[in-house]
Swiss-Prot record:
GO terms for molecular function: acetate kinase activity; ATP binding; butyrate kinase activity. InterPro entries: Aliphatic_acid_kin_short-chain, Aliphatic_acid_kinase_CS, ATPase_NBD, Butyrate_kin. It catalyses: butanoate + ATP = butanoyl phosphate + ADP. Disulfide bonds: none annotated. The keyword Nucleotide-binding applies. It is found in: Cytoplasm. The gene is buk. This is Probable butyrate kinase. Its EC number is 2.7.2.7. Keywords: ATP-binding, Cytoplasm, Kinase, Nucleotide-binding, Transferase. Pfam families: Acetate_kinase. It comes from Phocaeicola vulgatus (strain ATCC 8482 / DSM 1447 / JCM 5826 / CCUG 4940 / NBRC 14291 / NCTC 11154) (Bacteroides vulgatus).
Length: 354
């Protein structure tokens, strides 16, 4: 089956054609600041991005005769995971989303191209997947509720692939999935639902190459009211200039891991501390799953690092078997989900937020 995949990022647009799960063509480009300067809001980029996609297809002589079109999910209202048919409610919510991001355009472009092809249009496992159990939402401050923001697409895709590799369904397994990238998310996957996971974007859980993770609340409050920093600067400390970047002045884990493996400080101490926070979070998810864990999956770019994987395994491999599935293949994950929906192997969800 011919599956067309669209993945708009803040400064790039990537597209690919798959025959079943095999990529047969890919293209894309980085959009410069000049390219996007005329657009004051992301929604205004719709025609520009759509025409860009159609031009690349025309230049490659690829006709619009796909069996399905699937796009990266946007910043919708919280919704359970799965493959969703693009509907009018979804398009309305993307056009009126609280947060602007180019990923909101993916489903809109996919829907229009799919209409020309007379084929279904999907999204799968957007970043806003929310399957938290009730106890995981509450905090000690009633005005603050925990929210689910994590690497849903990759985490669920590797979970399904692992399940298939052992002759099981994702919905039969309990898994801890550790996504190791610029942000780090550690989720408890209970029979196909992520019932607890740290907010990998906004200051919760392990610290990461660019993010601060959980910070002692009293000290953070004092920092906020010290008069030294603006709200924007504090938020940048939490996401963008936190973690390894704050300690070491770099986010290049390949370089940091090489120095750490040679015993060079402060690289070894800081990287080992980051991995310690990851292991602690995995331990917390072990408790969430009441010790009934079939496997711990390590995925994301940092899972390519022998040093990081080795340190983590020393701390968590007594909990459950550790499975290595490094990297992050968003395009392949989207194609995998579309194929599953076309074959009837993955149930098609209807977007109806509460």
């Amino acid at each position: 089956m011919k599956i067309f995949v669209i993945n708009p990022g803040s400064t790039s647009t990537k597209i690919a054609l798959f025959i079943d799960e095999k990529p047969v063509w890919a293209a894309g480009a980085h959009h410069t600041a000049d390219d996007l300067s005329e657009f004051h809001h992301v929604n205004e980029q719709y025609a520009y991005r759509k025409d860009f996609v159609l031009r690349l297809l025309a230049e490659a002589d690829i006709p619009l005769d796909f069996d399905a079109v699937i796009a990266r999910g946007g910043l919708l209202k919280p919704t359970p995971g799965g493959v969703y048919a693009i509907n009018e409610q979804m398009k309305h919510d993307l056009l009126n989303a609280r947060m602007e991001h180019a990923c909101n355009l993916g489903a809109l472009i996919a829907d229009e191209i799919a209409r020309e092809c007379h084929c279904p249009a999907y999204i799968a496992d957007p970043e806003v997947v929310d399957e938290l159990q009730p106890a995981a939402r509450l905090t000690g401050i009633p005005e603050i509720e925990r929210i689910s923001i994590f690497h849903a697409l990759n985490s669920k895709a590797v979970s399904r692939k692992y399940a298939a590799s052992i002759g099981k369904h994702y919905e039969e397994l309990n898994l801890i999935v550790v996504h190791l990238g610029g942000g780090i998310s550690v989720g408890a996957h209970c029979k196909g639902r992520v019932i607890d996971v740290n907010n990998a974007l906004n200051g919760e859980g392990p610290f990461s190459p660019e993010r601060a993770g959980t910070i002692p609340a009293d000290q953070l409050a004092e920092l906020c009211f010290s008069g030294k920093y603006t709200l924007k600067q504090i938020k940048k400390m939490l996401n963008g200039k936190g973690g390894l970047t704050a300690h070491l002045g770099m986010n290049d884990v390949v370089t940091i891991a090489r120095k750490a493996s040679e015993g060079e400080e402060p690289y070894k101490g800081v990287l080992d501390a980051m991995l310690y926070t990851v292991a602690k979070q995995a331990g917390a998810m072990y408790v969430t799953l009441r010790g009934q864990v079939d496997a711990i999956i390590l995925t994301g770019g940092i899972a390519h690092s022998d040093y990081c994987v080795g340190i983590l395994k020393e701390q968590i491999d007594y909990l459950a078997p550790v499975v290595l599935m490094p990297g992050e293949d968003e395009m392949g994950s989207l194609a995998y989900n579309a194929l599953g929906a076309l074959k009837g192997e993955l149930p098609l969800q209807v977007y109806r937020p509460e």
